[in-house]
Amino acid sequence: MEAVAELSAPSLAGAPGEYTWIVAVAGVTCFLTAFAIGANDVANTFSSSVGSRAIPLWAAIGMSAVLETVGATLLGGAVTDSIRSKIIDFEVFRETPSILMTGMLCALVGAGLWLFLANHLGLPVSTTHSIIGALLGFGLASGNVRAVKWTQVAFIVGSWVAAPLAASAAGATIFVCMRRLILRSRQPLRRAKRFLWIFIYLITLTFSVFLVFKNFFELNVSCDQMVAGGRVEHFEPCRISRWADAHSGTALGIAVALSVALTFVISCLVYRFAFYRVESYRRRQKRSSRTEPRDASEEGTGPSHARPGGLLLTPRSCVAKEGERRPGALEDALRLAGEENARIASAESRLQKPPPLECMDTCADSLQINDGRAAAAKPDVGTAAQSPESRFAADPVGSSVPDRSVLAFSRSLAEDAQAAFHASVQHCASPRCSAASRGDSRYPLQRSTSDFSAFLSSPSSSVPPSSPSPSSTPSSPSASPRRPPSRPPVPRTCSPAPVSPSVPRAFASTATHGHPPALSDTDADTPEGPDRRRQSAALAGAKDAEASPLFADLAPHPERRDEVPAAKRERDARRTLLLPPRVTGEAPEGFFAPTVSHDDNGLVFVSQADLADSLGSGVDEEEDAPRSWRGKLKAAWRSMPWFKDIHAEGSTEDDLVARLQTGAEVFDTETELFFSACQVVSACMGCIAHSANDTANAIGPFAAILTVYQSGSADSEIGSPWYILLFGGLSMSLGLALLGYRVIKTVGVKLVKITPARGFSMELGAAWTVLIFSAIGIPLSTTHCAVGSTVGVGLMEPKHPRRETGDGPVAEGEEPKKRAVQCPVINTASVNWKLFGGVFVSWIITIAFSALVTAALFSFAAYSPRMVS
């Protein structure tokens, strides 16, 4: 107990050097704790903005770094009384200031450890509850049970349920009203402009109230304030927050007036910024329509239709339109099942009864093969995406997605390969073609399905070069519907064979491992050399497609196969479904910009390495690994965490996340762009307001240690110099930049589907929940409110959203089906409940973990025996 006696000295003024190590260690620990707070709690502020693609991740980090630093430096004076008023009564440690210093150091360590663990797991936890739990463990371990404010502990336990429920109700109410009044109206953008000043006023009012009632700047006036115990204290000079408490009516009027002034200024700025985005989107739409002309049936008639290859699908709505058929989800499923069964039966019949003999087009208009890589021409892909015979169908909610049926896709590829086989057996080889038509036994025509694989694998399947048949005549350019009119006519022996639109897709899926045989010098000198090379490549692709119709092996490039050991090739080989992607380079700034998209408007997220292998990009090793110092520096910069594509990562980590991201109701694109500007303003003001409280959680214990060390007593007021506040703000900004993407991905991508309109409702609901409960006097966690509001908005998704364009007009003489619109109040399938359950459990563990770690560290530091010289 000798150590306890030494730590129980009534004052530190006599020997401050003995406790200098506590101040030094506390400074380092304060930096790490602030780093973890920035990566967790500050990330919640911009999670909905990044999740909705209103701003990219790097822009959110840059904005938060500036706003957090400014807010912590100017408004971070709240650390003065934050620790004193939360959970610990400092008056108990008036006679033992050294114990207070040791306990605060242990509290920083305990809270920091839990926050780093939560950041690693991507769990959004309350940093306020972390530091409160650490202080609770310190108070209990010190033996001063009366130092703990148990009323605050009871409020915290109740807030685990009250905060998410209240924020969910607020966010859901705002979103439902916004959806009914604006998003589902006939002219949503015009209505959004009319409601703009109301939205901005609701944002600025919460910020103004915080600025007036939580401001710790001092005024040269006197004020009286009632403190704990019923005593009234006189303060001169008086802080703005204390003056506001003493003159609540006047302070509220000032807050309203300040909010009106901010609304006028910010509304003008937001209006210009929002319509800059809208006009940019319209210009891109015009350029896209000029560069990629489509049929009139494929083009959208309104601004809500997405550009080709974009992420936005056709908007869906629960509002039925007159004269349009609105089948339900069950009817849609039955209709799609019937179409699928009919298509499979037709494919089987064609396999058993092949079509008449025809020859493949020598120009290979629908298939382009070069150096072992196959790709489909753009008109073919567009036709495949829009044709009724394509392999794409509508899901139960109406979005156009690829058919994932393994059986259907396998049979489709087998059908395409069979069609290619029947076309290729007569390809420009007149002896074989004519002999097969005459029934010559030397050239047997293998028609049966069982002999199809044998034909492809046999050496005789290759077509020998031969001179053109005398009966062949040059064909006109109009003979092939896919050939551009400007191309010259090319002679062929027979009429072009009809090739299914998915034949290029089948061949492209096997191009990485179905490398066509090299062209010999003899073949290259003959006129049929190029034609034979194209046909051999097609047969090689069909062979691999028949052997493995659904999956393609991502093996190393054939030219570099010898450089890779066989064991490594076998270990690194993976099976994946390859579809011909198209990288979209133009998109609104940080808004709905997919990583890789398809012409059928579906999405697939592929890493750069897999994409390079699947497309056979042929990038040299010098480009992959830059040798110059500038190239290495640029590559290192692009690999930083703030350039991560969290949407792609979240969708590939969990299939449920991908379903949530594609199954939500889609609103007008321009209206969403308009709300993205409002969402950025809301996130910025929330970042400034939260920076003061977040700084208090990290700087508060360190400020207490520094004040006790400088004054030598624990009863003095805790100071907070500006340089300490600046230090805390910079530390939080660095933590957000390096580790904040984990929590942003959890809340903004993996929990529910977030768009700008939804994200704005979430932020507004969370802000008003904190404001109302703070006015009542009930402490809440901003993290709990943010997550609760996110879940509440997600629950408002309709179960079966339908396309806004409907299924077409009702046929003449047919009565439209009268069916009630089904818009359920709550849709539990639109929330990732497994993830939310883990987040809720982490909220409960927060206080327990921090308290146990802090109590263990303090017990070891204060009560462990030590050697005395």
Swiss-Prot record:
| GO annotation terms (biological process) | phosphate ion transmembrane transport
**Record's superkingdom?**
Eukaryota
| UniProt topological domain (Cytoplasmic) ranges | 40-54, 119-120, 176-196, 272-720, 781-837
Q: Where is the composition biased (Pro residues)?
A: 482-491
InterPro entries cross-referenced by the UniProt entry: Phos_transporter (IPR001204)
Q: Where is the composition biased (Basic and acidic residues)?
A: 556-571
Write out the catalysed reaction: 2 Na(+)(out) + phosphate(out) = 2 Na(+)(in) + phosphate(in)
Q: Where is this region: Disordered?
A: 286-312, 374-401, 453-571
What is its membrane topology? Multi-pass membrane protein
Where, in residue ranges, is this chain on the Extracellular side? 1-18, 76-97, 142-154, 218-250, 742-759, 859-869
**What are the entry keywords?**
Cell membrane, Cytoplasmic vesicle, Membrane, Phosphate transport, Symport, Transmembrane, Transmembrane helix, Transport, Vacuole
Family stated for the protein in its record = Belongs to the inorganic phosphate transporter (PiT) (TC 2.A.20) family.
What is the role of this chain? Sodium-phosphate symporter which preferentially transports the monovalent form of phosphate with a stoichiometry of two sodium ions per phosphate ion. Plays a role in stabilizing the cytosolic pH and osmoregulation. May be required for optimal virulence of parasites in vivo.
Its protein name is Sodium-dependent phosphate transporter
Q: Which organism is it from?
A: Toxoplasma gondii (strain ATCC 50861 / VEG)
